């Protein structure tokens, strides 16, 4: 690499954005093919390519940031702004689902029976599994904060314990959500209620899986001594994302499960 007289990271050409984009195309088209033709081939190909891209792209970033020292303070500042803007874009993404839900529920049409929930829909009890899920996610928010403070204080073992606990709580939430879907008395095809419920809670569930993956990578990196008390932005970004997922769930719980039922 040529000598440079500034602190910014001039990245090398990388194939991973292209392979990531192809994986996204395969995943979206594969989901449509799965829904309509019951074939999992395209979806499986998309998942494999996405996993390969994630592994190799994150490997390269760890090499550049942790071992080559390219993540200087100005670069980290840029990464912080990038993560903040990414989470902001996610807020607007979920805003669309809440808009759809409130648009349909605040002025239900005659086709829905003029009431909400629509006539014939049996809703889920908000004080059973959804309330347990809320407690699980709030607890995971506490454990991820514990992990953050442990990293800043150089408490390696406590960080590993707290991160492990957070990931387990994330997987437990996903399991409970899956069981709730399996036992739900309505489907995604049951009119606007089914559509808004499953799309909003389903995308949130996907974000929980993504957040759990981020934290699992952070756990592996912590075990391999990648983080110091001063240099741990990878974990910080994952923690921000986890708190965002937490807050979105609270809005989902209050809006769709409690008020909407």
UniProtKB/Swiss-Prot annotation:
| Biological processes per GO annotation | mitochondrial electron transport, cytochrome c to oxygen
SUPFAM superfamilies, from UniProt? Cytochrome c oxidase subunit III-like
**Listed GO CC annotations:** mitochondrial inner membrane; respiratory chain complex IV
GO MF terms here are: cytochrome-c oxidase activity
Which membrane topology describes this protein?
Answer: Multi-pass membrane protein
Which regions of this chain are Mitochondrial matrix-facing, per the record's topological domains? 1-15, 67-72, 153-155, 224-232
Q: What ranges does the Mitochondrial intermembrane topological domain annotation cover?
A: 35-40, 106-128, 184-190, 257-261
A Pfam family annotated for this chain is COX3
The cross-references to PROSITE patterns, in alphabetical order and at most eight, read: COX3 (PS50253)
Annotated TM spans: 16-34, 41-66, 73-105, 129-152, 156-183, 191-223, 233-256
Q: Which keywords label this protein?
A: Membrane, Mitochondrion, Mitochondrion inner membrane, Translocase, Transmembrane, Transmembrane helix
Report whether Magnesium shows up as a keyword of the record: no
* Keyword Translocase appears in the UniProt entry: yes
E.C. designation(s): 7.1.1.9
Q: Where in the cell is it found?
A: Mitochondrion inner membrane
Family in the record? Belongs to the cytochrome c oxidase subunit 3 family.
Role of this protein: Component of the cytochrome c oxidase, the last enzyme in the mitochondrial electron transport chain which drives oxidative phosphorylation. The respiratory chain contains 3 multisubunit complexes succinate dehydrogenase (complex II, CII), ubiquinol-cytochrome c oxidoreductase (cytochrome b-c1 complex, complex III, CIII) and cytochrome c oxidase (complex IV, CIV), that cooperate to transfer electrons derived from NADH and succinate to molecular oxygen, creating an electrochemical gradient over the inner membrane that drives transmembrane transport and the ATP synthase.
Name of the protein described by the UniProt record: Cytochrome c oxidase subunit 3
In which organism is this protein found?
A: Salmo salar
Highest lineage ranks of the organism?
A: Eukaryota, Metazoa, Chordata, Craniata, Vertebrata
